[in-house]
Amino acid sequence: MVMSSYMVNSKYVDPKFPPCEEYLQGGYLGEQGADYYGGGAQGADFQPPGLYPRPDFGEQPFGGSGPGPGSALPARGHGQEPGGPGGHYAAPGEPCPAPPAPPPAPLPGARAYSQSDPKQPPSGTALKQPAVVYPWMKKVHVNSVNPNYTGGEPKRSRTAYTRQQVLELEKEFHFNRYLTRRRRIEIAHTLCLSERQIKIWFQNRRMKWKKDHKLPNTKGRSSSSSSSSSCSSSVAPSQHLQPMAKDHHTDLTTL
């Protein structure tokens, strides 16, 4: 009772809301039409088809954007589904646009040529370049000399004397420590060696013999003798000049 009297006596204004019928008839929802929800014209038992019929390629060109000028777009409703990414909505009975045709399959030869680089030959036909061999990479010995090799001086190999050759050379060295040219040639032919090998062996054997007998080297002795002779020649003139200086000094004192 108190609540109703307060609302009557107060200046509270009762809001005037339009009835539901007027709101539906003149409002935003009424402008959409009776078939906005897609069930007024077709009935409650309408079932949209599950699969759209696929048209032939002759009916509609590739990449069609929509229906012709004579056809009208149906009203948008909840019972319709979008027809494509371009914003075109197709009715359930309207055929959807044809998907793009797949590109033609290339030929096997053309595919292989396109994948491979034309500048680079295939791996099977790649030409193998020969390895570059420089002169310093070649190992040449005296026994196996390449006649076509025109590089630097060939490297000499160490001669391996047999037991019989060493025995004959030791026997010859016991009688003669120095060989003549004629005797060296004879020994070289007998032992199947070269004159150079015989000469080098005797030089090494003489050095070993001097070392065993503790004899001075002939080269060192010759150098020491030459140095002593030069010293004696330089001292002799100074000794000769000393008496002459004394005589000259006595002459000056007498005057």
Curated annotation (Swiss-Prot):
SUPFAM superfamilies: Homeodomain-like. PROSITE patterns: ANTENNAPEDIA, HOMEOBOX_1, HOMEOBOX_2. Transmembrane segments: none annotated. Sequence-specific transcription factor which is part of a developmental regulatory system that provides cells with specific positional identities on the anterior-posterior axis. Keywords: Developmental protein, DNA-binding, Homeobox, Nucleus, Transcription, Transcription regulation. Residues 94-107 have a biased composition (Pro residues). It comes from the Eukaryota. Residues 31-127, 212-255 are annotated as: Disordered. This is Homeobox protein Hox-D4. Residues 245-255 have a biased composition (Basic and acidic residues). Its main location: nucleus. Forms a DNA-binding heterodimer with transcription factor PBX1. Pfam families: Homeodomain. InterPro entries: Antp_homeobox_Deformed_sf, HD, HD_metazoa, Homeobox_antennapedia, Homeobox_Antennapedia_CS, Homeobox_CS, Homeodomain-like_sf.
